Amino acid sequence: MKIFFLFIILLGIIQLSNSSSCNIDIAGDSFDLTPLKKIDGYHKVISDYGDIVYFNFCNTTIDTPCGNSALAYFFDGSTGECHSLGVQEFYSLNSYEEKKTLLINIRGGDIAYDSMVKMLEMFIAFTCDESDDTSEPSLINTMEYGYASVIWTTKYSCAIKTPNVEKKLITNENQNNNNFQFENNEILNEAQSNAFEISNKNEDLNNNNNNNNNNNNNNNNNNNNNNNNNKINSGISFLQRLNQMSQTINNRNEYQQFEEQQNEMQENRAEIVQFNDDIKLIDLEQKQPFYNDDQLMSQTNDDIEFEQDQTNFDTVNDDEIANQINDFMNNFEKTQNLDGDYINQEKIIPNIIMEDTKPNDLTQNFEIENEF
């Protein structure tokens, strides 16, 4: 009975340890992030502007000031608002560098309405440094392109070697030892034939060993420097790729905005051309004389009277004018009195010119003048 209870307790401990473990296998490499995982809590990184990113990984939700239903949250320090960064994890491996970088992408966050509709997300880059076991995550980007990015350099980010790789390494090591022993036997056989040569060769071997040791030390130092440089370059290249991806997305958005602006400018040009045509038409209309109804009636009456005068004038033909002149001359000769004087012509000429008189009227006027 006691054994049964001990078995149940041991099984519960094993299940608890499995639930708290964080092992990731990808592309033939295995990573153990269990020491970095928060069982009761969350990781927090703060930007210089007061923005905060809360996160955890290995599909473990967190209880944060922003909520407890997502794997990561973003707190906007300028507005005081919280946004979910995602609820699902996706893994990828950067194998372009000597030391591989494990990338965890948390997706499915809140929807953001910017130049285009997209969902917020987060990237966590784990870079390997076998000598660092106390580092903390560093915030690289906070929602500039719709995602938050964190880089974490630690020894727990290094891939675990598989048994096949270890066996291969051991086999290579044994083969090297056999080759080394074979070479030593040849040297000993040659040394037995000539002691002087043995001693010189031993000295040469010692010198070579010293040189090899110095070279090994230099190589170790160079390897350490290269490892540090590779670690830095790995993180930098990863961030550069992220920025290139973001820049590509932004370039597409900017190109779409550029096309929209070009279309809008063409529409504005068409409106401007139409507006200029309307202005020219208005100017032409303003240059034409404008009359109201009274002015039009007055102008029309004046034109009618002028046409009537022209009609009356045209009805007097040349024969009538010649007859009037002959009558005038005949009457003028009769106006001479006994003293040989002539009646003032001004009294007769205006009547002929201003009035349409007949010869009988002229004779009547002449007789009236003589009576006075």
Swiss-Prot record:
Transmembrane segments: none
PROSITE patterns recorded: MRH
Coiled-coil intervals: 185-282
Entry keyword annotation includes Coiled coil: yes
SS bonds (residue pairs): C22-C58, C128-C158
Subcellular location field: Secreted
Protein name per UniProt: Putative uncharacterized protein DDB_G0278881
Source species: Dictyostelium discoideum
